Amino acid sequence: MPIDKKQEKNFTNKIQEEGQKSLDTSLTQEIEILEEKLNKNPDHKGTINTTPNDNSTSKNSKDKDFKFKKKTNSQNFKKNANKKPEKEFEEKIVNIARVTNVVKGGRRFSFAAVVVVGDKKGRVGYGHGKALEVPDAIKKAVKDAQNNLIRVPIINKSTVPHEQWAKFLASKVMLKPAPKGKGIIASNSVRAVVELAGYTDIYTKSYGSRSKENVVKAVFDALKKLRYAEDIAKMRDLDIKDL
């Protein structure tokens, strides 16, 4: 049967009314729920909480701190790696010479180095090294010098206790105390030994052969003979005043 226009309108109106009723009921239910919440929490304003949870913030902060620590640790490690360790002894090269060794097949060339080592606090030593390359010869000389250290007396933290002469082969050396502020008066080879021993004011004089290695050995012979006044008094069974 064909449907009248009136019936069709009535049908649509019914559907719209039912839909409106369902909407109204759902809205009233939601309003009631919100009112209950407001009654329970009067401070609650019904705003949407956009701030993150405490757990999430703490996690993020921990992650940031961890990353920052990682960076700082790596930076500190790099800084420490770049830092050079402080050396106990200072080194000075006195002489480097090219040496030939004649063998059956011909000549063999090598390098010889003389190095002085000291801590500027009363310990000093010298060494001799020989190798096919200059760096290797210097390393050997440094090791030899560290194995041949001697301790020397220093008066007033600046000079030798008394005048001393020494001789090695054709080289002769004199060491003499100097007043404070005078400085080191010496040749290059003698200065290397005296500075690294810890003397800051001293007179020196060298005679005879100018061979650098022989002069260094003569200086070491003179340093070995140096004594404190107390030691000399004990050896002679005397008071320091009687010397």
Curated annotation (Swiss-Prot):
Keyword Ribosomal protein included in the entry's annotation: yes
GO cellular component: small ribosomal subunit
Annotated spans, Disordered: 1-85
Superkingdom in the source lineage: Bacteria
Domain S5 DRBM: 89-152
Cysteines joined through disulfide linkages: none
GO biological process entries: translation
MF terms (GO), sorted A to Z: rRNA binding; structural constituent of ribosome
Keywords: Ribonucleoprotein, Ribosomal protein, RNA-binding, rRNA-binding
KW Transit peptide (keyword) present: no
PANTHER family, sorted: MITOCHONDRIAL RIBOSOMAL PROTEIN S5
Assembly and interaction partners: Part of the 30S ribosomal subunit. Contacts proteins S4 and S8.
Function text: With S4 and S12 plays an important role in translational accuracy.
HAMAP family (alphabetical): Ribosomal_uS5_B
Family assignment from sequence similarity: Belongs to the universal ribosomal protein uS5 family.
Name this polypeptide is given: Small ribosomal subunit protein uS5
Native organism taxonomy: Bacteria, Bacillati, Mycoplasmatota, Mycoplasmoidales, Metamycoplasmataceae
